[in-house]
A protein has these predicted regions:
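Forkhead-associated
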Residues: 102, 110, 127-175
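Intrinsically disordered, low-complexity acidic Ser/Thr-rich regulatory segments
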Residues: 1-122, 134, 171-184
Length: 184
């Protein structure tokens, strides 16, 4: 698995490339870092979404849904699907000014993958998350310190269910434990 330092290095290289290649990315990145600071785009704790049973549900900004399908290595939204390729890094975010479209930028393309309702209080961040298609076949997800957070829900092939929450400390978490109907 990638070390945090090597993952951050790949993110930094991609930020530089995407800023030169895509005017929409440059505008999103510049306005985001002007608001939150130059070091606001950081790797935190990558989570492996490969070796999972389809789909892994990815929620960005509370209401924007994407689906990762490991059997096809695709990230799916209502507008398009992106094949996650080995060795390619993808940054998820939105344009500035706000146009209600979630974008995936990579060295290969800029793609609109999902719509979101800009009337909600919490929308995806301009620079929100990263997905890395690792050289070894792993697919890693990480929230890049977005102000609106991310949720992953799915099941590994073991099978073992998981829910991962990337959020600021101010976000309240309400967990209701249910009595298990099956063996411990």
């Amino acid at each position: 698995m990638q070390t945090l330092a090597s993952f951050q290095e790949k993110v930094d290289e991609s930020l530089t490339l995407f800023r030169r290649k895509y005017p929409s990315f440059e505008e999103a990145y510049s306005s985001y870092t002007a608001q939150y600071g130059g070091d606001s785009v950081q790797v935190h704790e990558p989570f492996r979404i490969s070796e999972t049973i389809d789909p892994v549900i990815i929620v960005l900004g509370r209401t924007t849904l994407l689906f990762y399908r490991d059997s096809q290595r695709t990230l799916n939204g209502s507008l398009s699907s992106i094949e996650i390729r080995k060795g390619v890094l993808y940054i998820l975010g939105r344009r500035e000014p706000l146009d209600s479209r979630l974008i995936v930028w990579s060295k290969e393309s800029e793609s609109e993958v999902e719509r979101f309702d800009s009337r909600v209080r919490i929308v995806p961040s301009r620079i929100h998350a990263v997905i890395l298609g690792g050289e070894n076949g792993d697919v890693l997800f990480d929230d890049l310190g977005s102000s609106s957070g991310s949720i992953l829900a799915g099941e590994t092939k073991k099978p073992e269910p998981f829910i991962t929450l990337y959020a600021t400390p101010r976000v309240g978490i309400h967990r209701v434990e249910l009595k298990s109907k099956y063996g411990q």
